[in-house]
Amino acid sequence: PWKMHRQDLSPLLEDPKSKRIAPAMLVHTGKIYGSVTAQIPAADDPKLYHGPGVPWYVMLAEGRYKYVRNLIKDEMEELYDLDRDPEELTNLALDPLHAKRLVTFRKKAITELHRTKAPFAANMPRPSTLKE
């Protein structure tokens, strides 16, 4: 019933050292899908969380970096250097040296959400790290 978005990964399987053309995105909305996700539940609504308290989030990985945005108002964004920090212990989102990269990843994630027509793309809560 919902449109699926995909990329052909066969070039990566044929040559694991080849580079992905597009970033990888994961959208976690628990067990809620499609048009029902147009309205993001409030922070105190159990529908926002899945399993052991994991909220809705958007993750975008490209190259050595991974960006995570929890869909809770005033929640901090996350940015990790997966080469230097594969366990994702050091959040670079507040590091001034990575400010431009954070803005770039934020914009790429929003662009990809609009491209794939994610119903909640226009209603995302403002993160605490947004300084624009």
List each model region and its residues.
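C-terminal cap/loop subdomain of S1 sulfatases and analogous C-terminal strand-loop tails that border
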Residues: 1-78, 131-132
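Long, internal low-complexity/basic segments
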Residues: 18, 72, 92-132
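Intrinsically disordered, low-complexity polar regions and short flexible loop motifs
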Residues: 85
